[in-house]
Structure formats: structure tokens, C-alpha cells
Amino acid sequence: MPPKGWRKDAQGNYPTTSYIKEQENITIQDLLFPKSTIVNLAREVPQQSGKKLLINKDASLALQRGATVFVNHLLLFAREIAKSQDKKSCSVDDVLSALDHIGHSALKGPVRDKLDEYQAAVEQRKKEKLDSGEVDADGDIDMGEDKENVPVEKVKEHDEIEEQGDALQDVEESSEKKQKTESQDVETRVQNLEQT
């Protein structure tokens, strides 16, 4: 029996999950980028007067909606380009080609520059992590996702302790085997003496 509140359709069947998902209307409100992010990006635009940019509520809403529509429109064409090349995901080249396709080829330069800046910043963070000697417990470079950072020296020390522990365990096992064989030898000698 379906959950309470579900109604039968015209054929008398209860709706399936895919049917329900098709009935949901997705509005632009569901897709909007965070307002604070959009406003901060708008404030980063250099101004000739040097004064701080004030953006009122209506302007920030217009920027938020406009940015969302533009990015979704661009992604639609980037996906089509990727699909025409039998790719499952969009790459940077697909997005740049989509900019040409929608008539915004003048944006290719700034987009490429920002991408290069971002990639350089990521590489710089990786180098800083390597230079600081902080690695995850599993030996990978920490990119800020895990809270447990362990210095490289501690990881090496931990590995050495594990190796020493393994060696000690091997020695203990071999000494136990020796004792067993010696006790078996003594028992066989005693039995031989008793028989004679």
C-alpha cells in the first residue's frame, strides 16, 4: 500500500517515483547561485573612481538571476558540444567552444586568464603543503578536506615502529616453535628411555 496522501491517476494506478519527479516544477529559485557570492564578484570589478560599489537589493537580485541564466545557457551548449564528440562530461575546451557558439567569444580571454590563475593557485597550495611536510594519515597530500594532519617525520616513525613490531613478532613466533620442538625432542627421548 502506498504512503498516505498519494492519489491514483486516471488509470487507477498509484504514481511511481519517476512520475512524481516529472510532476515537480523546477523554478529558477531552485537553481540560483548564492547571492553573497554574486555580489562579492560584482564588487571585485575595478572601478575608475576608486569608490566602493554599493549594490541595492533589486540590482543584486538581477545579477543573481542573470548569472544563473547565463551559466545554465552556457552549460547547455557546452554539454551539446561534448555530446556531439561522444564525451560524457564537459571540459574546459567545450566551455570555451560554447562561448564562441553563443556569441560571447570576447569572454574567452578573461575566462582563460581566470582559469590559469585558479590552476596556479591550486599548484601553489600543493607546493606549500609539500614544503610544510604535512600529509594525511594515509600518506596523501592534505588539500584541506581532512582534519588529521600528521608531519612526514611522524608517518616515517610510525612505519619504522610497525616494521620493528613485525620483526619482534617473527622472533617470538620462531622462539615459540623452537621451544615446541625442544619439548617434543625431550618427550621422545623420555619415551625412548622408558621403552629400554
UniProtKB/Swiss-Prot annotation:
Q: GO:BP terms for this protein?
A: chromatin remodeling; DNA damage response; DNA-templated DNA replication; error-prone translesion synthesis; heterochromatin formation; leading strand elongation; regulation of DNA double-strand break processing; regulation of DNA-templated transcription
Region annotated Disordered sits at 125-196
**What role is this protein assigned?**
As accessory component of the DNA polymerase epsilon (DNA polymerase II) participates in chromosomal DNA replication. It is required during synthesis of the leading and lagging DNA strands at the replication fork and binds at/or near replication origins and moves along DNA with the replication fork. It has 3'-5' proofreading exonuclease activity that correct errors arising during DNA replication. It is also involved in DNA synthesis during DNA repair.
| Misc. remarks from the entry | In eukaryotes there are five DNA polymerases: alpha, beta, gamma, delta, and epsilon which are responsible for different reactions of DNA synthesis. Present with 2100 molecules/cell in log phase SD medium.
UniProt feature, compositional bias: Basic and acidic residues: 144-159, 174-188
Which residues lie in Acidic residues bias regions? Answer: 133-143, 160-173
Look up keyword Cell membrane and say if it applies: no
Enumerate the subcellular locations listed in this protein's record, separating them with semicolons: Nucleus
Q: What is this protein called?
A: DNA polymerase epsilon subunit D
A cellular component term from Gene Ontology for this protein is: epsilon DNA polymerase complex
